[in-house]
Amino acid sequence: MFANNVMFDYSKEPSRDILCIDCKSFYASVEAVERGLDPLTTKLVVMSYYDEAGGQSRGSGLILASSPAAKKAFNISNVTRARDLPYPYPDDLVIAQPRMRVYMEKNQEINRIYKSYVDEANHHVFSVDESFLDVTDSFKLFKVSSAYEMAQKIQKDVYDQTGIYTTIGIGDNPFLAKVALDIGAKKEGDMIAEWRYEDVPDTLWQIADLTEVCGIGHRMARRLKGMGINNVYDLAHSSYYVLKDKLGVMGAQLYAHSWGVDRSFLGTPYTTKDKSIGNSQVLPRDYTDKDEIAVVVKEMADQIGTRLRRAGAQTQVVGLGLGYSMGYFDTSGKRGIHKQVKVTPTNQSKVIAEVALYLLSLLYDDQVIRHISLYSGNLVYHQAIQLNLFESENNQVADMKTDVIVDTIRKKYGFKSLVYASSLKAGGRAIDRSSLVGGHAGGMAGIEGEAHG
């Protein structure tokens, strides 16, 4: 240990009872339960572009989710190619087409169970299959004596009501709960792991692969290894001041995390005051490629344009928000960043996309992105069309006509019947995730009757 290094007094750090709950192989589990099958023992994959009525025809898309048994039997992971499966397909392999709306409905059902244990302020949805709960103040109400007992109770409730298995990490703070889930829970027979401050030397410091820790990507791991830091123990016993000097606020945060310290609290999400129409996506993985992020932003702009036109509205403000991966902080110590600009009233998808991509160029600087939000605000509702004085009148009218044609086709044949070619690129979400409901995975929120803002 370095002389005069920063030390932490756990007695002065936040100590709550935080649960990080993950629905095990969520999409695949939902499909198994819908078929009356066991989610753990059934070999099942969710595959895009697979014709279930086509017998042994080979799928050509992505494997979006795999059951635990399928992963083990075929040595595959989530988000692999159809060609990675043995062909002809084994008789005991179940292949399901993705049904995002079904998954979102099941997600909402499960989150209602969570909310029966905690209030809104103590419930945070991290992704479609993962949530944080602060159950510190819920023990007496549910007549339990520990966070572990509470976790067992919630786990049983979710399974009894939905048939979905959950894994749970318990910690004094969100970070410890998250790493307990990611690393500890999957090794336990009851799929629950509890990591407390006093357990750090025997749990957190035993992690050999830095990239297993949320907030440390491969690029950061390489930088740390260049500094002689090869595992979490090395990180905890390195110089705080050297880390801070070389990596800025991120270095300070990594040092704190290596000691299991996280001073963040669960809270309610930010909502804009002005009436707005927007979309918010929790991405299926960390995005670090600007081009991939741009594809998603453009898709979301297209969705918002459609929703504005359906509502008979025009926006005077376009805003973009980028949320970072769990545990990631930028050089300013922030967990996310957002920016908005005023625009001439519009509901044209092309204009909204151009503004959104401009905002992306201002905001993105190699951060690790897990959440994207795009919104339109200060809406005006009237029949008159306001043209931009600095652009060709003919071009603007032509773009409006194009939007009307696109809307007509999508209304009849579905949103993904007509999408940008860029949606076929890596990172695209509009096709494989064709129903953006509740802020995750798709592209139809507000277009087929929903109004998620």
What are these regions, as identified by a protein language model?
Residues 1-128, 132:
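Residues that scaffold, gate, or flank divalent-cation-dependent active/transport sites
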Residues 128-135, 172-177:
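Short, conserved phosphate-binding/catalytic loop or strand-edge motifs used
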Residues 30, 334-453:
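Acidic, metal-coordinating catalytic segment for phosphate/diphosphate chemistry
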Residues 8-13, 20, 212, 222-366:
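DNA-contacting surface of Y-family translesion DNA polymerases
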Residues 150-209:
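Long, highly charged, low-complexity intrinsically disordered interaction regions
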Residues 128-131, 314-329, 375-384:
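Core structural elements
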Residues 133-155, 225-228:
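Catalytic palm subdomain of template-directed nucleic-acid polymerases
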